[in-house]
Regions:
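Residue-level signature for tetratricopeptide repeat
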Residues: 62, 66-69
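Extracellular S/T/G-rich loop segment that most often corresponds to the catalytic His/Ser-adjacent loop
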Residues: 442, 448, 456-533, 537
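N-terminal domain-start motif of subtilase-like serine proteases
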Residues: 105-116, 203-237, 242-251, 318-328, ...
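Substrate-binding/access-modulating region of protease and related hydrolase catalytic domains
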Residues: 322, 356-462, 510-515, 519-521
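Subtilisin-like peptidase catalytic core
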Residues: 19-26, 68, 115, 119, ...
Length: 573
């Protein structure tokens, strides 16, 4: 049985031309790639004992794309049925295959755009909005942001570069990406206006009805009054940087590690560098993206659509890097705001990592891995020196990072060798992090599970996939207590908290709502810090147990209940 992603086969495909060529190549050439990928994936499903639902969804989703591209419409219903069977969340289960069914019927019946618009409104409108609403809004957002020039730019500036480095011997998933891009270009893009209009009609109908899920999260919260007898508590924010002007800090405010593992005491808030003058515009685009995902037609969302629609191929790379840099700039401050909300006794320690935002990956080496490992050990040692009680880790890593970088730089003899090398190098980092955390038994570490709707332990994420007595891994629920469609899950994900449209600070003091397990884990950090502040004599294990024992079971979700956890410790609120 396949028990981890590392056990899945790695394959390469020899291209005749650069990936961007296939965006406009004769269809027969793309069809040949589709046949190769389809044969390999089907062989895996037939011969390997794969039980991980997320992996099966990835396989079946690719096979569905290949069938649609090839015009094998008779295969679509069966693949959709298999895909739905692997969906264990109500939202994705409801929406899976609806669009594929419409496109299949449109092609088989040679229907026009008006028919497509009507069918989209009819079929998506028939779904339970409580389950399907977020998926419908997300699909509409993705369609509205489709820009073939942007896709062309990504191919030319990223995939082509990787293919040149590898002498056109590329990972099989690049071949699948080529087919998927042609499918979108040929089948979806011509119907974009009709598809968006149909989905907009569904969104508008439910907006008019003002259907909202009940909020069970907010009543569970509690704040500590400044006048209450409590003690200061050190809270580590191990993240991309924090604007410490917004928070009270520990005596030593923090430590910084660059992307290569080197430590400094500067740049606790990540510098924007040359992008600094454009911060107001970048902030608007991030806000616009969140509004766009929520199907809100705000000035910020309209500005985002205008910018994306106007992108030329040569601007794709710079736009992606701008968005990546901006996300890193805001992330840590937003997380910190959640972690210390309602706790005047919290003192923030910024454990800043200056992760790279460029599209080109680092060049892997054992020296790099050992520097990062040493950086992890030094960072945890600084937590002990500052006597922190709880540290939030809203980030994750895996061997896939190394495997991608090795592939990009064409290191290793073949795909399987790169997998081996990646695991070897990543183990240096993973083991150092695990051992350092285990060596700080009085500190409670809180990790975000991930946002890929997959299994943290199957993917072997760190820190989310680790099992340590002083670690809690957190999944994301919405305010109604339902698991979000994006949240990573698995046996190491032991508690859930609100990670949906959580409002917190940006650098400079403005506020914004963001989604993710990155927003869920600091909710648990927040609870732990409050418990430590109110009863400083509590041990790490007492606080961890109170958090877990206070959570309410809701299916596979165990939703944190801060008030109940406090009551279990005899804390009167």
């Amino acid at each position: 049985m396949i028990t981890s992603s590392d056990q899945l086969p790695r394959r390469s495909v020899k291209l005749d031309k650069l990936p961007s060529y296939y965006l406009s190549a004769p269809r027969a050439e793309v069809q040949a790639l589709a046949e190769v990928v389809q044969k390999n994936l089907q062989s895996d499903l037939d011969t390997l004992d794969i039980r991980d639902a997320a992996t099966l969804r990835e396989y079946l989703g690719t096979l569905l794309n290949l069938a649609q591209f090839k015009g094998d419409w008779s295969a679509v219903p069966g693949l959709v049925a298999q895909l739905k069977a692997q969906q264990d969340k109500p939202g994705p289960r409801a929406t899976t295959g609806v669009m594929a069914g419409i496109l299949a019927d449109q092609q088989l019946g040679d229907r026009d755009a008006a028919w497509v618009r009507a069918e989209v409104e009819k079929r998506f409108g028939a779904l339970d909005w409580t389950d399907a609403g977020e998926g419908i809004k997300s699909t509409k957002s993705q369609l509205e942001l489709m820009n073939p020039q942007f896709v062309k730019g990504v191919f030319e500036q990223q995939l082509d570069v990787a293919a040149r480095n590898a002498n056109l011997v590329v990972p099989e998933d690049i071949a699948a990406t080529i087919v998927g891009a042609r499918l979108q270009q040929e089948l979806v893009l011509p119907l974009k206006t009709a598809l968006v209009a149909g989905l907009q009609a569904v969104v508008d109908r439910h907006a008019a009805q003002a259907t909202a899920k009940p909020d069970v999260w907010t009543p569970r919260q509690f704040a500590i009054a400044p006048t209450v007898k409590a003690s200061e508590v050190g809270v580590g924010i191990w993240d991309s940087g924090v604007d410490l002007k917004l928070f009270k800090t520990t005596a030593v405010p923090g430590l910084t590690m660059d992307a290569d593992g080197r430590l400094t005491t500067g740049d606790l808030l990540r510098p924007l560098g040359e992008a600094a003058p454009r911060w107001p515009e970048l902030q608007q685009l991030i806000k616009g993206y969140m509004d766009q995902r929520a199907a809100l037609d705000t000035p910020d969302a309209r500005r985002l659509r205008e910018v994306v629609a106007g992108l030329k191929a040569e601007q794709a790379k710079s736009f992606q890097e701008d968005m990546s840099l901006t996300t890193l700039y805001v992330h840590g401050t937003h997380v910190a705001g959640i972690a210390v909300a309602g706790n005047p006794f919290a003192r923030v320690y910024a454990a800043t990592v200056l992760w790279d935002y460029k599209t080109e990956p680092f060049k892997p080496s054992e020296e790099h891995a050992r520097r990062v490992a040493a950086g992890y050990r030094a960072m945890v040692e600084s937590f002990k020196q500052q006597k922190l009680r709880v540290v939030n880790m809203s980030w994750r890593d895996s061997a896939a990072k190394y495997e991608y970088a090795l592939t990009w730089h064409n290191m290793g003899t073949d795909a399987e060798d790169r997998k081996r090398l990646a695991r070897q190098l990543f183990a240096i980092e993973r083991d150092a992090l695990r051992d350092a955390m285990a060596g700080a038994p009085d500190i409670l570490f809180v990790a975000g599970a991930g946002n890929e709707d997959n299994s943290a332990d199957f993917e072997e994420y760190v820190p989310a996939g680790l099992q340590l007595p002083n670690l809690i891994t957190v999944g994301a629920a919405d305010t109604a207590g339902d698991e979000t469609s994006f949240s990573t899950f698995g046996k190491t994900v032991v508690v859930y908290a609100n990670g949906f449209e959580v409002e917190s600070y940006l650098p400079g003091g403005d506020k914004m709502k963001l989604n993710g397990t990155s927003m869920a884990s600091p909710q648990i950090t927040n609870l732990a810090a409050k418990l430590f502040a109110l009863q400083p004599g509590l041990t790490m294990l007492q606080v961890k147990n109170a958090i877990l024992d206070g959570a309410d079971a809701r299916g596979r979700v165990r939703l944190a209940n801060p008030r109940k956890s406090a009551e279990l410790l005899g804390i009167a609120l």
